[in-house]
Amino acid sequence: MNACRRNITPWRLRSRTLELGRRTLIMGVVNITPDSFSDGGRFLDPEAAVAHALELLDEGADLLDLGAESTRPGSRAGGAAGSEYARAVHPTDEDLSLPPQEAKTTSWGPRLLGTPAVSSEEEQARLLPVLEGILRARPEAIASVDTYKTATARAALAAGAEIVNDVSGFQWDPGIAAVCAEFKAGVVLMHTRGRPGEWRAQPQLPPDELLATVRAGLTASLAAAAQAGIPPESIVLDPGYGFGKRLAENYALLARQAELLSLGRPLLAGLSRKSFLGHTLAPLFGGNDAPIEAREPASLAALAAAILHGTSIVRVHAVRPAVETALIADAVLAAARGGPM
């Protein structure tokens, strides 16, 4: 495997510009939800969430990503039981092999196809006090808001957020791109293969077709951004690991991730504690998926692979181990290009 050569690229945010590619930037996750798969509502209280965010910054996070609606396994969004949602978002190969009419139904999919599971008002009520508290304590902090809703994006940007991280890549709420353009925000556009309620009906794709599908989806997101007046230098792309991809597809995508750099924008990868990592570790856990708390070493291995395949930003839950891993991977990249470590 040849290490990828990242380009040094500016990323223009709402009030500042970051340099991407010289070293890997660490985006620390702050979940402000009662049902996050990773931390189970530990930081729903605003004071606890702010304290956690400040700890992540002290551990070396370059950016913070604040989310107030869970889009991960174990969520109870829209009234769905956690196991129902987990199967909708990260279905097993058995689930995915069933014809659509035989697949198990969930309450999450239809809601996401229609109205959001968490209203924008509730999302803002969770999010804004934490965002404001972080910026009071650390005015220099760079905050991203993880949302696909126009109203939430507007409120967060007005409150000082620099970045909108949209898991739908501007595909689920048509107004959000215009808001990002209005505020001159940085944006992260992620690829999601359809919507969660549709994923079980989708066939497994061979690597070439999978990469073409991800490329086409990200190209559509770039077109939506351009139509809204968002300049390319404000955009980072995310391949969307775990979002509408089976276990084998995630690894195929990771192995060929660097080919997405041909789209002309830097890459962000969110691999931390993902369920496909837990499934891969199942032989070590009696045939069961590795529990969340046991996935950190696998997360770091995936993080290193992503960096060596062209990622400029990694989105993580445990910041200090990610900082250390990124330093080693960046040293490999520097050696590959013949530059200083």
Report each predicted region and the residues it spans.
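Catalytic domains of carbohydrate-active enzymes, especially glycoside hydrolases
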Residues: 51-67
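N-terminal amphipathic alpha-helix/helix-capping segment at the start of soluble metabolic enzymes
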Residues: 1-31, 226, 230, 333-341
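Short, low-complexity intrinsically disordered segments enriched in A/P/G/S/L with frequent Arg
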Residues: 89-90, 94-104, 110-116
